[in-house]
Amino acid sequence: MQYPAYDPDGNVVRNAIYSEELIKRRYNSWHTYEEDLLNLGWCAHEKMAEVMNALPDIEQRTDKADLACGTGLLAKAWRRQDMVGYDLSYRMVELSRASGRYARVSELNINRTPLPKKYDLITACGLFGVEMATAICLPNIAASLKDDGILLTTMPQHQGYYDEAGWQFQTSFELIDETEEFQSWLGETSGTPKYHKILTWRKVNEQ
């Protein structure tokens, strides 16, 4: 199954279309995922944990879910076992469960269905990116949040991802804060350095 991004007129706006099969194949066979990311200096999970801690009402947001949780790097940086993890890859779910970093971990495709309950806060660290998810899944994420729920996302600042993935057309969330750009792969020595921001979104409640 492929999930392109569309503009309001129904035109595909992204060249690299998200492929469920490709993502599953990649991550189901990636046994050294966490080791490889840390060796390349991936640090976005630490930045997102800092943003979580800085939310003024974080203690009141008791129901928290982590989308595309991988092996649980965000939960490790968060240092509390009060989050629920979801991932498309059964291998990542297995590794994350074994880590004990989440209260619970389940396999789920957010492009197909909302989460099974509503949360106060949803995090998506690494879910959105080139050849990854597009803005088309945002209605399902919004449906998984309580009224005035918060979504934290990493947002690539390279390769035109924001425009190609249809974010300028989404109506499910309003942007309320963003960090400065930061180099997300500190150990990368080849090619152009890649930068991300952490964006804070509030769910737009239906009138």
Q: Which residue ranges define each predicted feature?
A:
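A short acidic, Gly/Pro-enriched loop at the edge of an enzyme's catalytic core
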Residues: 113-122
